[in-house]
Design a protein with these regions (language model features):
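NAD(P)+-binding Rossmann beta1-loop-alpha1 motif at the extreme N-terminus of oxidoreductases
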Residues: 1-53
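Nucleotide donor/acceptor-binding cores
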Residues: 2-3, 129, 156-158
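Rossmann-like NAD(P)-binding element
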Residues: 57-99, 103-106
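Rossmann-like NAD(P)(H) cofactor-binding subdomain of soluble oxidoreductases
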Residues: 85-147
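A non-catalytic, amphipathic alpha-helix used as a structural packing/dimerization or gating element
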Residues: 90, 170, 174, 229-247, ...
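Substrate/ligand-engaging "lid" and interaction regions
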Residues: 138-237
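Long, low-complexity C-terminal extensions of enzymes
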Residues: 258, 263, 271-352
Length: 360
């Protein structure tokens, strides 16, 4: 009998995960909020997704497509959350009412937000529920339309942190049935600080803002926009990220080693240029893109807030958030999740590491 899993979200990540997992023989319950279900009416009507690219070419049947969250997670052991970061609070509160002992929730990606799920679950007194997060979506993917997804590549390794960290080994062993390239890191904080999107999206978006607004999507983000000065800014952000990881005593590696290029190099510009998948990526079309609206307030800003609490200086990251706020017309420092939202405000480094390890 096929293993049942739930995939929450009907966007890029949700389409790719539902199609890939179904194609590999898992029984997939795909959920989309009723407010947005009309965007993927074709999938609701046909229960089919056409996939192409690195994970195979097929039109696959999705066992369940629903806007009933309780129905979606009924009798499943693993729940994969692939929704924008600004929706994580809503999903955390909703799942806290419905999850049951023995279930594992994996946020793809998390960028610390697994802590929001854990906080909400603890409020409900939930026992024997595990929350994991990945450092990126498992796939470099683009929707080609409702019910159609292009998977350009699969991330290998795909880093994962588990809350509580004391359950990492058993949890990752189970999750590798779905994502064999998973590589465990020390905690969900270590995983969140390994997130790729804030590093490789934000500097290019800010330094190419005029070109992005003018081109309206007819712009190859990496081929045209990832010039040497953008690469240097990216590496400056990366150094500050590594300094924060180092302050916790966590293992670290430069972003150039994690983007999946065909050569091994310490130069992020060379790494990006060596991967033909980056050359295909156009956009963003405007400053409403998730590259801005998600990766600055929900990506870089939580890093900077944690750095401030841990007395780690991150001036380049801070400048990106401040300039991003001016570009976007709203305060990216306050729009994203706070340490209070994550349930870790006021903790010393030692207290935080204990909480990450034990969940208490």
């Amino acid at each position: 009998m096929a293993v049942k899993v739930a995939v929450l979200g009907g966007g890029n990540g949700g389409h790719a995960a539902a199609a890939d997992l179904s194609n590999r023989g898992f029984c997939v319950h795909m959920y989309e909020d009723a407010r947005f279900a009309g965007n993927i009416k074709k999938v609701f009507d046909t229960h089919e997704i056409t996939m192409a690219g690195a994970a195979g070419n097929a039109t696959v049947k999705i066992d369940m497509v629903t806007s009933d969250l309780q129905e979606a997670i009924q009798d499943v052991e693993f729940i994969f959350v692939a929704v924008p970061a600004f929706a994580h609070d809503v999903y955390a509160r909703a799942l806290a009412e419905l999850v049951h002992p023995g279930q594992t929730v994996m946020v793809m990606p998390g960028t610390f937000d697994s802590l929001i799920f854990w906080k909400e679950f603890r409020k409900k007194g939930l026992e024997d529920v595990v929350v994991a997060e990945t450092n990126t979506l498992p796939y470099a993917t683009r929707l080609q339309g409702p019910g159609s997804t292009l998977i350009m590549s699969l991330f290998n390794p795909l880093k994962v942190g588990v809350m509580p960290a004391c359950r990492t080994q058993e949890t990752v062993e189970k999750l590798r049935a779905f994502y064999p390239s998973l590589e465990a890191v020390e905690s969900v904080i270590a995983c969140g600080l390994s997130s790729l999107n804030p590093i490789i999206h934000v500097p290019g978006c800010i330094l190419n803002a005029g070109r992005i607004e003018y081109a309206k999507g007819e712009f190859y983000f990496y081929t045209e926009g990832f010039t040497p000065c953008v690469a240097r800014t990216t590496e400056a952000i990366d150094k500050e990220r590594i300094a924060l990881l180092d302050s916790f005593g966590y293992a670290s590696d430069i972003v150039a080693h994690g983007v999946g290029g065909s050569i091994i190099t310490d130069d992020i510009g060379e790494a990006i240029a060596s991967d033909p998948n980056f050359a295909k990526i156009k956009g963003p079309a405007d400053t409403n893109s998730r590259y801005y609206a998600e990766d600055i307030p929900y990506g870089l800003a939580p890093w900077a807030k944690l750095a401030r609490a841990m007395n780690v200086d991150v001036p380049v990251i801070g400048s990106m958030i401040t300039i991003g706020s001016a570009l976007l017309g709203y305060d990216c420092w306050t729009r994203g999740h706070s340490l209070q939202d994550l349930g870790i405000e006021g903790m010393t480094k030692e207290e935080l590491k204990e909480y990450l390890e034990t969940g208490k």
